[in-house]
């Protein structure tokens, strides 16, 4: 299964509560935090919610 490298590139200050919750669920707490997650529909949904705050790359 593919994996996604998710990097937070913008601050969560001034965002809606559901966007802050999605960042926390992804494991991102501050700018330049990086997590690697499985490519699943649940993860894609959280990434879609905060796509303006993160950068996503596919890794092997």
Swiss-Prot record:
InterPro entries: Ribo_uL30_ferredoxin-like_sf, Ribosomal_uL30_bac-type, Ribosomal_uL30_ferredoxin-like. It comes from the Bacteria. GO terms for molecular function: structural constituent of ribosome. SUPFAM superfamilies: Ribosomal protein L30p/L7e. Pfam families: Ribosomal_L30. Keywords: Ribonucleoprotein, Ribosomal protein. Part of the 50S ribosomal subunit. Belongs to the universal ribosomal protein uL30 family. This is Large ribosomal subunit protein uL30. The gene is rpmD.
């Amino acid at each position: 299964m593919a994996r996604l490298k998710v990097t937070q590139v913008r601050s969560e200050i001034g965002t809606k509560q559901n966007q802050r919750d999605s960042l926390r669920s992804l494991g991102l707490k501050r700018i330049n935090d990086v997590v690697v997650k499985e490519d699943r529909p649940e993860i894609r949904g959280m990434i879609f919610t905060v796509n303006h705050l993160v950068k996503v790359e596919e890794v092997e």
